[in-house]
Curated annotation (Swiss-Prot):
GO CC terms: cytoplasm
SUPFAM superfamilies (alphabetical): Phosphoenolpyruvate/pyruvate domain
Residues reported in the UniProt entry to bind Mg(2+): D78, D117, E149
Assembly and interaction partners: Homodecamer; pentamer of dimers.
Active site: E215
Its EC number(s): 2.1.2.11
Region (Disordered): 1-40
Biased composition (Polar residues): 1-15
Protein name: 3-methyl-2-oxobutanoate hydroxymethyltransferase
Function: Catalyzes the reversible reaction in which hydroxymethyl group from 5,10-methylenetetrahydrofolate is transferred onto alpha-ketoisovalerate to form ketopantoate.
Cofactor: Mg(2+)
Organism: Mycobacterium marinum (strain ATCC BAA-535 / M)
Amino acid sequence: MSEQISEQSEQNVYGASSPVPAGESSPSAASAPRTKVRTHHLQKWKAEGHKWAMLTVYDYSTARAFDDAGIPVLLVGDSAANVVYGYDTTVPISIDELIPLVRGVVRGAPHALVVADLPFGSYESGPSAALAAATRFMKEAGAHAVKLEGGERVAEQIACLTAAGIPVMAHIGFTPQSVNTLGGFRVQGRGDAAEQTIADAIAVAEAGAFSVVMEMVPAELATQITGKLTIPTIGIGAGPSCDGQVLVWQDMAGLSSGKAPRFVKRYADVGGELRRAAVQYAQDVAGGVFPAEEHCF
C-alpha cells in the first residue's frame, strides 16, 4: 500500500496533544480521523520545527491510553528490565522477555509508531546478529522499527538493517547497556569527549538511522548535534533543543520508586493514587462495605 499521504491526512496524523503546523487547528478525535504515524512524519516535523513526545510503554492498556492521548511514538524499551521484571540494570533482559510486551503495545496503539529496543547481546557481534534479532521483533511482535545503542561501533549493523527494510532508531551519549564500561550513570560528551559524541551522531545518520536518541548529553552539545543532523534527535537529559523528548512513563507519571533522575519531570502521582486505591479497596472488603447491593446480581 502506498505510503503517500494526502495533505489532509498529513494534518490528521497529529494527535490532540501532538504538534500542528502554524495556521492549522489541532484536530481531535471528534473532528478528524487520525492517521498511522510513520518515520517520514518525524522527518517532516523536524523540517517544520515541530517538537513531539515519545514515551516508553510495556503493555496493551497503557499503550491504548497513550495512543488515545496522541503520543506519536511509543518505545518498548529494554527499561522493561527495571520497571517490569525488576532487574537492577537493562543488561539481563532477553528478546524472549521483550517480544510479548511489544505484541501487546502494538495491539493497543493503532496510531503510534511502535519502536522495539534490541536488548544487550542481541546485536553487538555484527550485522548478521542484529538482522536476526530485529527480524524477530518485526515478524513475531509486529514492531514498526527497532532501536539499538551505540554510535560508530554499530554503524554497520544500522546499515544492514536499513538495507533490509527495517527502520532503525539509534541511541548515543549515555547508553544504559554499557553502564559497566561507562563507570556508572554519568553524563557523556563533556570536554574532549564531545567530538566522539558528534562523530557517533554523524555515523548513525550516515548509516541510515531515521532518528537518534541522545541520553545524558550536555544541552549545548545536543543543540549543536541537532543542528548538524537532518534526522530527528530525541532527548532524554539532553536539553530542550532536541526535535523530540522521551521519558520512561513510570518516571513521568510518578509510579517509579526512589528519587527521579534530574532530567525527569513528574506530571502525576500515579504510584500514590494506586496505593490509596488499594488501601481503600482492602478496607472496604475487610469492613464488609464492598461489594454493596449495587455490585450484586
